[in-house]
Amino acid sequence: MKNNILFILAAILTISCSSGIDTDKLKTEKFTVYGNCGMCKKTIEGSLDGVKGIEEANWNPKNDKMTVSFDSELITLEQIKQKIADVGYDSDSHRAKDKVYDNLHGCCKYERPKK
């Protein structure tokens, strides 16, 4: 019984420590994503949760800078920016659809850059 418990704990630890991404292939990029608040942060970062190839995503509401570490063999920077735009947030190169932006919570409606 004791051996079974130790085996299960070792298996859980091994699985939880492995992201499946080859860290030697990770690329880190910084770019602008417009937003306002903590709710924006949750939505922006959440748009990349569980996306294959994304290792880490962090948006800073103080300077609108997004930092993403990803495996460029699994996902491109353009795809990442599109996923963020799909939830209503403009970046330096991708614009969210007006209808999606209009559905953001009031505190999340940032001043949109000119088209």
Q: What spans do the regions from the language model cover?
A:
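Positively charged n-region of N-terminal signal peptides that target proteins for export
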Residues: 1-4
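C-terminal motif of bacterial Sec signal peptides marking the signal peptidase cleavage site
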Residues: 13-16
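Bacterial signal peptide processing site
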Residues: 18-20
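Short glycine-/aliphatic-rich beta-strand segments at the starts of folded cytosolic domains
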Residues: 23-35
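Post-signal-peptide N-terminal segment of Sec-exported extracytoplasmic proteins
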Residues: 35-67, 73-74
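Short amphipathic alpha-helices in soluble, non-transmembrane regions
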Residues: 44-47, 79-88
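Conserved short beta-strand edge segments in small beta-sheet-based binding/regulatory domains
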Residues: 88-100
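Short, low-order "capping/linker" segments at domain edges
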Residues: 102-115
